[in-house]
Regions:
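Beta-hairpin "wing" of winged helix-turn-helix
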Residues: 61-76, 84
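Amphipathic alpha-helical dimerization/coiled-coil segments
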Residues: 88-115
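N-terminal helix-turn-helix DNA-binding core of bacterial DNA-binding proteins
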Residues: 6-50
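Basic amphipathic alpha-helical segments that dock to polyanions
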Residues: 51-58
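Basic, amphipathic "hinge/linker" alpha-helix immediately C-terminal to the N-terminal HTH DNA-binding motif
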Residues: 74-96
């Protein structure tokens, strides 16, 4: 059973990118890495060590879990493990995005007024 979420905002960049990647659907590890690269327009690259280390902590915190959903068996390798966002993970992502919006609003206000 997953522990209560101990990952509070601010989230690490790796955790944020993984949550974003899973927010558009279940993915296996390599699929998550490719989605992170696409989402960041190639600016963020995540290797397997960072990915699986972060995901282990995220599973423990209840942010993500293994998914029973599978892609078309004709197009997929049965050895792949798929992951999905939990309700706690979605809430953590929403809280982090709210925090980012607040930071951006302060920055834009200061830049607009030359501060």
């Amino acid at each position: 059973m997953a522990k209560k979420c101990t990952m509070h905002a601010p989230l690490t960049p790796a955790v944020l990118h993984i949550l974003l990647a899973l927010s558009c659907g279940d993915r296996h590890g390599y699929g998550i890495m490719k989605q992170v690269q696409a989402d960041s327009q190639g600016r963020a690259k995540m290797g397997p060590g960072t990915l699986y280390g972060s995901m282990g902590r995220m599973i423990e915190a209840g942010l993500i879990r293994e998914s029973d959903k599978r892609a078309d068996p004709e197009m997929d390798d049965e050895r792949r493990i798929y992951y999905e966002l939990t309700g706690t993970g979605r809430a953590a992502l929403e809280a982090e995005l709210k925090r980012y919006r607040s930071v951006v609003a302060v920055a834009e206000g200061r830049l607009a007024h030359g501060q």
